[in-house]
Every structure is written in C-alpha cells, then in structure tokens.
UniProtKB/Swiss-Prot annotation:
This is ATP synthase subunit delta. Keywords: ATP synthesis, Cell inner membrane, Cell membrane, CF(1), Hydrogen ion transport, Ion transport, Membrane, Transport. It comes from Cupriavidus necator (strain ATCC 17699 / DSM 428 / KCTC 22496 / NCIMB 10442 / H16 / Stanier 337). F-type ATPases have 2 components, F(1) - the catalytic core - and F(0) - the membrane proton channel. F(1) has five subunits: alpha(3), beta(3), gamma(1), delta(1), epsilon(1). F(0) has three main subunits: a(1), b(2) and c(10-14). The alpha and beta chains form an alternating ring which encloses part of the gamma chain. F(1) is attached to F(0) by a central stalk formed by the gamma and epsilon chains, while a peripheral stalk is formed by the delta and b chains. The lineage of its organism: Bacteria, Pseudomonadati, Pseudomonadota, Betaproteobacteria, Burkholderiales. Its main location: membrane. InterPro entries: ATP_synth_OSCP/delta_N_sf, ATPase_OSCP/dsu. The keyword Heme does not apply. It is found in: Cell inner membrane. It is a peripheral membrane protein. Coiled coil: none annotated. Belongs to the ATPase delta chain family. SUPFAM superfamilies: N-terminal domain of the delta subunit of the F1F0-ATP synthase.
C-alpha cells in the first residue's frame, strides 16, 4: 500500500497540475474522468490485460481509452499512454484517490466516512453532516456505511481524525477502566 502510494503520488500531482491549468475543462470534470479511469483500472479483467506482457503497450492504451465513457481530451490520452509506457496503469486507482485528495484540499473540503449502527435517514444524515461541517470548518462529502456491531451511535472518520461515539467503543472503554 505505501509503495503504491509512493509510486502514485508524482503522477497524481502532475495530473492535478495539468487539470488545474487546463482550459479543456473544469476541475470537477477532470475529477469525474480520473475517478472513472481509476474504476476501469481496478477492474479485474483490465488488471489481467495490463499485467499480460504479451499485450503491446499501444493496444493496451487503446483498449483502456475505448472502455472510458467520459469524453477525453489530449492531455488525458497522453497521461494514459504515459502510464502504459511506464508500466504503471495498475496504479491508476491510487492515482485517482490522491487526485481526489488534492482536489478536496484545493476546494477546502474533505471526505467523511460515517459508520452507523442503523441506517441514517435523510434528515438525520443532513443534520449530522451539518454539525460535522461546523466542527471541522469545511465542506464534507459523506460516505455512509452501516455496521450493526457498533450496537448504537456512530463512528466518524475525517482524514486521520476519528470520532467514535458508538456504544461498542464506550463499552470497550468501560472494560479497559474496570480491568486496569
């Protein structure tokens, strides 16, 4: 994981720089394209083709580009060819993640992972996200998961910060206090 992140970082930073300076579209359109590229590269069939040494690079790039549904500009085509030429197409999912982090940093926003013991309804989720935005002082994009093992409450992760108000964590804290 760390090795993949190290390999992907310069590509993500270069692509972000190109996207920021490009007149071919806004950062949102680039973000959607890069996310799609990451999803396609993560596909097991595409991984198998990318890992096959018998597939020529130009054919691999052509195949990859043909699978994408988003409109492509010349910069994106050259980027894919660069990845293929350097044998780094399989790193595209990590490049997409790092591109997204760079975009969020530019916009002053973050992703938030909310894990709840029960499904959150629309107003509950909106109120929770609004409270978290006030706490963290930036726009948050929520990804919600349900984990019944929490028993009750929620666990929130924004970047490297974790707020765990679940019943499970409170019980674990009580157990630690009682056994100490």
């Amino acid at each position: 994981m760390a090795e993949t992140a190290t390999i992907a970082r310069p590509y993500a930073e270069a692509l972000f720089r190109v996207a920021s300076e490009s007149s071919a579209g806004n950062l949102g359109a680039w973000s959607e394209l890069v996310s799609e590229m990451g999803q396609v590269a993560a596909n097991p069939d595409m991984k198998a083709v990318a890992g096959d040494p018998n597939v020529p690079g130009d054919k691999l790039a052509e195949l990859f580009l043909s699978v994408l549904k988003s409109p492509l500009n010349d910069e994106a085509r050259r980027f894919v060819k660069l990845l293929v030429d350097n044998g780094r197409l399989t790193v595209m999912p990590e490049i997409a993640e790092q591109f997204h982090v760079l975009k969020n940093a530019r916009e002053g926003s973050s992703d938030v992972e909310i894990t709840s013991a029960f499904p959150l309804e629309g107003s509950q989720l909106n109120d929770l996200v609004a409270a978290l935005e006030r706490k963290f002082g930036r726009k948050l994009y929520a990804q919600v998961a349900v984990d019944p093992s929490l028993i009750g409450g929620v666990s929130v992760k924004v970047g490297d910060e974790v707020l765990d108000t679940s019943v499970r964590s409170r019980l674990a804290a009580m157990q630690a206090t009682l056994t100490a």
